[in-house]
Amino acid sequence: MIEVIILAIALSMDAFAVSIGLGATKQQSKVAPLGIIVALYFGLFQGIMPIIGYLGGKGVLSWAESYTPWIAFLLLFLIGVKMIFDSFSEGIEEDISKITHRVLLILAIATSIDAMAAGFSLTLLPVNPLIACLIIASVTFIFSWLGVLVGTKGGTWLENKAEFVGGITLIVMAIKIIITS
């Protein structure tokens, strides 16, 4: 279960980083409702996408069981490397000064693609995938809400650091899968 919590924290770093950026664009009086709305979008998508990855992984598992640790390693490692590279970018490139439901939907999908890929690794963990997805959704909800709050206080300089830490965490998990399999 500790692996699921670590995975949830690592996956939530994308959403946390984007939430900081969203929070930095809003005035103090609008932070509370924005924080809840952002957290709902990001938490929901981060919870749904691993199920999609898990189901895909189960289909692959039947014909490639001996390769699944390597596939999970490769996916987590590549996601981690991507997150580290993304942490050096300038942040959210599109104009989010008008945060609409459409913008939040696009951002929620974009930040949860890695959760879908990571869902594949749930086939290797001795956990109920639905409980794992609920944990991932809950952790992402909390981090997204906190991200909006932090964004209003700390600005955007924390965005990249959160994504970097998430990337390192996924790489460490990938290495652990190879070592223990």
Curated annotation (Swiss-Prot):
Major location category of this protein: membrane
Compartments (UniProt record): Cell inner membrane
GO annotation, cellular component aspect: plasma membrane
Xref: Pfam families: Mntp (PF02659)
DNA-binding keyword on record: no
Bilayer topology term: Multi-pass membrane protein
InterPro entries referenced in this protein's UniProt entry, alphabetically: Mntp/YtaF, Put_MntP
Keyword tags: Cell inner membrane, Cell membrane, Ion transport, Manganese, Membrane, Transmembrane, Transmembrane helix, Transport
GO molecular function: manganese ion transmembrane transporter activity
Transmembrane residue ranges: 4-24, 32-52, 68-88, 103-123, 130-150, 161-181
Membership in a protein family: Belongs to the MntP (TC 9.B.29) family.
HAMAP family linked: MntP_pump
Function in brief: Probably functions as a manganese efflux pump.
Record-given protein name: Putative manganese efflux pump MntP
Annotated source species: Colwellia psychrerythraea (strain 34H / ATCC BAA-681) (Vibrio psychroerythus)
Protein's gene: mntP
